Amino acid sequence: MLPCYPRRPIGGFRVAYEYANRLVARGHEVAVVHPRRFASATPLLATSFYQRLRRQGARLRDVLFPPHVHWQPIDKQVRMLYVADLDASQVPDGDAVFATSWPTVEHVAGYPACKGKKFYLVQDFDPWLGPRERLQATWRLPFQKVTVSRWLYKQVVDAEGGPENVVNIPNGIDHERFHLTADMGQRPKQLVMFFRRESYKAPEDGALALEIAKRGHPGMSAAVLGQAYRKPPRVPPWASYLRRVSDDQLIAIYNSSSIFVGSSLAEGFALPPAEAMACGCAVVSTDCGGIREFAEPEVTALLSPPGDPEALARNILRLLDDDALRQRLAAAGHERIQSFTWERSTDQLEVFMRKQVGRG
């Protein structure tokens, strides 16, 4: 159960699709349900006239241009369902039903038993995603929980009061796509960073860190990736801005860059830096929680406190000024991330599902 239509690349959606692809390859029947009406805590009448107008426009767009996932390979055996909302009548019966975000949990909680054993794929936690109390309340519902990092696992276990119904299964990386195509030691001093408008991504902090680093190392360049049609004003004028790149383009950018920069305040796992590691980038990031699953300070990455662009810039400059350190971190990160595979994650998920569905 996803919270909305897949109009743009979203990390949590990619995780769901990766599992769906691999589960159908193992003989399971999988349907991925996308509601047109966004599953959120904000009712339509409580929003502004402009927001209501945008939603009406989105409905018309969905009628004229049916949704299609163009940014992620989907196995033909996966049933991609696009429905009006997450009412139980819109959802097929099954052995297991997975909520993938806290708003979807609130819908799935009321489903009858014929929809399947209830699971919750916990992918994020931060106050920017919704009311903290409601979010944490979903962790206490009688679902079987799957967290994507030890950081999230600890928070869910603390909220639930024990680990009985919680398992940690880290995300995988598709190494057939995200892999080295260029020597890590022969790369230009180019940085790559995402500029996403969500406040918890703290894009302004990342942009400021780039500006500070540029003053200390004028020869550096940067590729900033985003969704907006126009280059955001906070993106430095000297940086290139690339909108809605494909995976092939992203892999090429990673392989032509030396350093990946992450500025988030909180992340459940942080797929982009993990995928950048797989492509040979040294990672400089905020210590945003779930990134610790693969980012070990001074070993596979340089981490700084969230909300401190000056500290982020200092770590960028450390790598720009010390190529041996950059190459050491890039090599260690690349080696570390090889153990994160979707096959391993799917093995663990399949075992957990069979155990819980059989128990039910």
Question: Where in the sequence are the language-model features?
Answer:
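Short acidic/histidine- and often glycine-rich active-site loop of Leloir-type glycosyltransferases
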Residues: 233, 288-298, 302-303
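Membrane-proximal helix-turn-helix segments that form the acceptor-binding/catalytic region
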Residues: 84-93, 126-148, 152-155, 159
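Acidic anion/phosphate-binding donor-loop and adjacent secondary structure
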Residues: 127-134, 157-158, 165-187, 252
